[in-house]
Amino acid sequence: MAGTLVVIPTYNERENLAETVARVRAAVPEASVLVVDDSSPDGTGDLADELAAADGAVHVLHRIARNGLGAAYLESFGWALEQGYDPIVQLDADGSHLPEQLPSLLERLGQPDAAGGRVDLVIGSRWIPGGSIENWPRHRELLSRWGSAYARWMLRLDTRDATAGYRAFRADAMRRIRLEDVHTRGYGFQVDMLWHAREAGLSVVEVPVTFVERVRGRSKMSAAIVIEAAVRVTAWGLRSRFGRRSMAQPTNGGSGSSAAGRSRA
């Protein structure tokens, strides 16, 4: 099995899921979709099963508990690589990542980079020229910009939008990342993955996207999540400067965390 896989993690996204999946399938008809649901009490998982039953390109992973965005992505990456998908895309369920812009990410992936190699990871960026946000309050924009800038400074990253979640990976490049060493489950997962991608020597580029605030449902973001991410980034940065990076955290949440595999193969 080959082709593009768009991974959509969900928790209480019943109001948004069907529209997002339909837009992905319209924007990139050849792509498959994997919904990774953390036992949403609002019935998102049941809706995902209905979508999979109606469309053979839609698949579902049901996880037995809410274990964080990072754990959901890590399990889905393992599944995608086992099934032979390439490339692998991250996309939010709430409509904030516009599926209509996915072709621009996929087009850049695999093209020559500035060093004469191939682009391994494309990030849809809000903070490069041409990128933008819609309907965000000023304080949230400032917080996001600060988070990216702080991660860049602490970890010596080149990426302008280090916390962005709209990403496309080449499968071969993802295999070079030590996914078993990516332990972050919450907001800091995107930075953790980016840092590991850099350490693995991946070629990373950004393309401009428009990030749109959700119009239905509640955001999962909170001050506690942001603080946790900042603490982790600080610890990683200090360890990278003054000693070996050590992560005393649980291993990959994909192990034993799924109640069922895919609804459709």
Question: How does the language model describe each region?
Answer:
Residues 30-40, 62:
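Short beta-strand/loop segment that forms part of the nucleotide-sugar
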Residues 85-96:
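Short beta-strand-to-loop acidic/aromatic patch adjacent to the donor-nucleotide binding site
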Residues 61-82, 99-187, 214-229:
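Acceptor/aglycone-binding surface of glycosyltransferases and processive sugar-polymer synthases
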Residues 1-3, 156, 180-265:
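Hydrophobic helical membrane-anchoring modules
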Residues 37-46, 95:
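A conserved acidic beta->alpha catalytic loop
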Residues 4, 31, 57-59:
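Short, conserved active-site loop motifs that form the nucleotide-linked donor/cofactor pocket
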Residues 13-27:
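Short, well-formed alpha-helical segments that are part of the catalytic scaffolds
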Residues 15-19, 42-51:
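Acidic helix N-cap motif at the loop->helix transition within catalytic regions
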